Amino acid sequence: MSDIQTLSFEEAMRELEATVGKLETGEATLEDSIALYERGAALRAHCETRLREAEERVEKITLAANGQPSGTEPAEGL
């Protein structure tokens, strides 16, 4: 398992889906299930953060006088 902070949104979503699948089978031991749940919660939080950052970037797109995108304005913290 890789460090969650280094994962792209798509990588984190794939891992989260796989984690949920493992939990849904019910075949993991209790300890493994707890570890999977904890990692899944961290993956979910990472995905939410990446989505929020993307939303902020989209909101910062600047428009020219004709209404066409003319560039971007960096969002704070990015």
From Swiss-Prot:
One of its GO terms (molecular function) is exodeoxyribonuclease VII activity. Its EC number is 3.1.11.6. InterPro entries: Exonuc_VII_S, Exonuc_VII_ssu_sf. Pfam families: Exonuc_VII_S. Keywords: Cytoplasm, Exonuclease, Hydrolase, Nuclease. Gene3D superfamilies: Exonuclease VII, small subunit. It catalyses: Exonucleolytic cleavage in either 5'- to 3'- or 3'- to 5'-direction to yield nucleoside 5'-phosphates. GO terms for cellular component: cytosol; exodeoxyribonuclease VII complex. It is an enzyme of class 3 (hydrolase). GO terms for biological process: DNA catabolic process. The keyword Cell membrane does not apply. It is found in: Cytoplasm. It comes from the Bacteria. Belongs to the XseB family. Heterooligomer composed of large and small subunits. PANTHER family: EXODEOXYRIBONUCLEASE 7 SMALL SUBUNIT. HAMAP family: Exonuc_7_S. Bidirectionally degrades single-stranded DNA into large acid-insoluble oligonucleotides, which are then degraded further into small acid-soluble oligonucleotides. This is Exodeoxyribonuclease 7 small subunit.
